[in-house]
Amino acid sequence: MARTTPIERYRNIGISAHIDAGKTTTTERILFYTGKSHKIGEVHDGAATMDWMEQEQERGITITSAATTCFWKGMDGKFPEHRINIIDTPGHVDFTIEVERSMRVLDGACMVYCAVGGVQPQSETVWRQANKYGVPRLAFVNKMDRSGADFFKVYEQMRARLKANPVPIQVPIGAEDKFEGVVDLVKMKAIYWDDASQGMKFDLRDIPANLVDTCKKWREAMLEAAAESSEELMNKYLEEGDLPEADIIAALRARTIASEIVPMMCGTAFKNKGVQAMLDKVIELMPAPTDIPPVKGELENGEAGERQATDEEKFSALAFKVATDPYVGQLIFFRVYSGVVNSGDTIYNPVKGRKERIGRILQMHANQREEIKEVRAGDIAAAVGLKDVTTGDTLCDLNAPITLERMEFPEPVIHVAVEPKTKADQEKMGIALGRLAQEDPSFRVRTDEESGQTIISGMGELHLEILVDRMKREFGVEANVGAPQVAYREAIRKEVEQEGKHAKQSGGKGQYGHVWIKMGPNEAGKGFEFIDAIKGGTVPREFIPAVEKGLREALNNGVLAGFPVVDVKVTLFDGSYHDVDSSELAFKLAAILAFKDGMRKASPVLLEPMMAVEVETPEDYMGDVMGDLNRRRGIIQGMDDAAGIKLVKAEVPLAEMFGYSTDLRSMSQGRATYSMEFKHYSEAPKSVAEAIIAKK
């Protein structure tokens, strides 16, 4: 089967934004205009096509990023048909992991901002993730019809808060209830959409007289940004004072793909204005899979390799999401970087070292699906029948293994104990939790050794609440949930040398292991580092892995309160052995003893997770909010003003933030909102640490 759309006409984009910027509505409109959904789905009435889990429709927030394919020929049909694969990403900070994984497989992103709220905390997080993966971006300022809408304020915020280089390529005609359309600065024409056809039809008119000067000013800024793409274009611009349309588009495209500029557009998705023009810009300015550097990975021999985005290249793909589907079981969403794969093919997963057979391949449209026979470079699809694939795994040709760069997933910061309500739920709960953990790498499940309880960990209260809810709905498991607990850590502050000796001589073969270690603090976030500095075989080669294993085991339970120990550097520098009595077990036990004794002397401290908290509050409640954050041991980092709303930034220990949403609601009569994300671990004050240790 030949390719239906050339790869140059593919656009793999994400739509990403803060919670209420109107991202799902924007995606719905895209599906409507591209003819994939015949009736517009409104989030307000819980019918949005993209939000397909029951909970999303109830809560009106997007939890899983659904992938959808649609086709577009331009507002006036001027382009050959382009294929746009859209990944809708969640805006709630507890689901940052979803954003992170979709960023990894996108070629470009459309950042949706609310014209009133502007750049909000989650927007900054998403921006950082897009920077990390080098994703080119467009900005769409939505909700221009809302009171307080201000396109240029969002422009300033993008510069100040995101340190971005936004370039408006449209100017709004009016704002709030007077918002009528946009001026296209490339064509210098005003675009008005027709309400009766829900924006399917439009008119091009002259620019309203009161906007001519504004448009000239912003067009000049846009031309300068375009001209900076090359010396030759700059000279042409300086000589002629203007540039032809084709040159402007080509130059803006080159600079957007290089992540040097972020073209800005505006509209109101809800009122069917602006999304159509944004789609045109996705085609004109966003990269095709062939416009970005070839994907990099590691070959079987450990050397660096890459794969070109062509059908002739060997097959390679990245699994970026695992979802359980009520009809077909487990779906693995994957992005094909190179080559072709057919349903029924056997492929290789180098991360797990397993062969897998692809049963069926489905092209997704929100939660409707179409079965297809093959997928090619640039495609995003879902596979059924893969047995052991986790998010971030590579799928590739059996005869040309390559492991694509893996994704990094954050460590969970909050955990709760869950207990099945009945004996019958016990086994089902184990299966359900295993499934959910496979779908979501930021969710962990373990059994507490002391209490025998099942502990689940995640990125925040909402994250865990939704997972427990899914357990009930999708797997029919009723569970009791304990109070949330903070994931504390332990660390050391001093460098010490310590001996560890395990010797038992009781007739027959004894046990003998003896080590000297030097242990000290490692850089924050570096984790555990083991250095083998044995000279002259005082500890034989074959026992050194056992020493490291013992140390890693000892890290699981610190000496203060049994929390995991982080950021420690341990050097094994001396020891002794016995020809007959030494064994791996003896050296492992000696290492554990040395670590425990050494840690007691190395000024152990308790670390607690600190959260970056941003509160938006009307001025009247400012005093209460600040006072309350101080009481919660918060450190105020800064304050900002936005249209009569005060923005307070603080760093607060997670332990003090439980139940904050309820307290904030009552303190501000429901008018203040907040967002919070994990920042880093820091040393808990002495009084706090003592109280936690005493509880243990």
Curated annotation (Swiss-Prot):
GTP binds at residues 17-24, 88-92, 142-145. Belongs to the TRAFAC class translation factor GTPase superfamily. Classic translation factor GTPase family. EF-G/EF-2 subfamily. NCBIfam families: EF-G, PRK12740.1-3, PRK12740.1-5, small_GTP. Catalyzes the GTP-dependent ribosomal translocation step during translation elongation. During this step, the ribosome changes from the pre-translocational (PRE) to the post-translocational (POST) state as the newly formed A-site-bound peptidyl-tRNA and P-site-bound deacylated tRNA move to the P and E sites, respectively. Catalyzes the coordinated movement of the two tRNA molecules, the mRNA and conformational changes in the ribosome. The gene is fusA. Residues 8-290 form the tr-type G domain. Keywords: Cytoplasm, Elongation factor, GTP-binding, Nucleotide-binding, Protein biosynthesis. Pfam families: EFG_C (PF00679), EFG_III (PF14492), EFG_IV (PF03764), GTP_EFTU (PF00009), GTP_EFTU_D2 (PF03144). It is found in: Cytoplasm. GO terms for cellular component: cytoplasm. GO terms for biological process: ribosome disassembly. It comes from Thiobacillus denitrificans (strain ATCC 25259 / T1). The lineage of its organism: Bacteria, Pseudomonadati, Pseudomonadota, Betaproteobacteria, Nitrosomonadales. This is Elongation factor G. GO terms for molecular function: GTP binding; GTPase activity; guanosine tetraphosphate binding; translation elongation factor activity.
